[in-house]
């Protein structure tokens, strides 16, 4: 996975929300971008030994196949798009 702090393009962004401790399950995450608009998200992905903490303004590009879990550590808003 690659983390970046630059905003992604507006092409296919849809802002969604997660409540504190709520979990988003992504079964086909490869090629997707996750950008945090508000709050803090914890991200882990099958086959990746590293976990990620993303804060508002940061984004992550999923480079592996497999299940990814995204958990809100605070009230959060995010955008998920295809890379």
Per-region residue spans from a language model:
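Ligand-binding loop in jelly-roll beta-barrel domains
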Residues: 64-83
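Short, charged beta-turn/beta-strand-edge "cap" motif at the junction between a beta-strand
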Residues: 30, 48, 66-69
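A short, N-terminal "cap"/entry segment at the start of jelly-roll beta-barrel domains
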Residues: 1-8
